[in-house]
Amino acid sequence: MREDIRKIVLIVLEVILAPFVFISAIILKIFRKLGPRRLPKNTKLLKIIGIYPLRDHYYEPQFKYDTFDEDASKNRVLCGLDLRPDHQIRLLNEMNYQDDFENFLSDQNKKESDLAFNFDNGMINTGDAEFLYNYIRHLKPSKVIEIGCGSSTKIISSALRTNNKNSEHICIEPYEQKWLEKMSDIKVYRTPLEKVKSDVFDILEENDLLFIDSSHIIRPQGDVLKEYLEIIPALSKGVHIHVHDIFTPNDYPKSWLDEHMLFWNEQYILEALLTNTNTYEIVAALNFLKNNYYSEFKK
């Protein structure tokens, strides 16, 4: 009933807003035609409000995907990128902690609501969650650093405790998840990654884990560039890196780009880093496994 009311409200809002959006779009198109330098006060006003119009132009981020290939199972041609499928399947067969993960799920009703993990979290869903838990159990890291935290933090924290090692868990989360401070077994940095000193990552050693789930967007002097050009190249040999929301060898899902209007591009700098390299190797590409080796992945 509540969902039906919500749908009706959204339909009414669409009808009411449509003429205003149309008129605003015409005005903003004129603004972009004249250019922000010619209209500095209007440009400043848009920055204060926190919104800026994009044009359908080859110099700007893409937001129209009329010709986008929707075949999610179609692998892109990525010359020089070794996905190592045999190694990935071997890893899946070696990880056998699903019973412990089920115990982790059953324990969630004993926790405060904001500290409990559930699959209806909008961040890390089935498949990703099971793999992350199993991988932490399998890897048994002494130290984990998360860049971007949330439901993954709950999974990692539980897996580390079950490993029964004196592990260190550091979370870098400047924007969200106010409940992090309630978790006594983690150290929280409430600082944008761009301002975190890179020597924080010097503690990571062989078989430790760096988990990345940050802005997903390449920006000048932004977090993604710091991760891939400053932090990752300086890591000690044998450190494992888990990057969330990667769909290699496919593109990002069309619904994410066309419906949710996400401008994410992190995946492509990661693919460039992994192309024709002996420095890094792919351990697991979950979207690839799901689309090409589903029976092995499902186990």
Which role fits each region the language model picked out?
Residues 2-162, 166-242, 246-299:
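A short alpha-helical cap/connector motif
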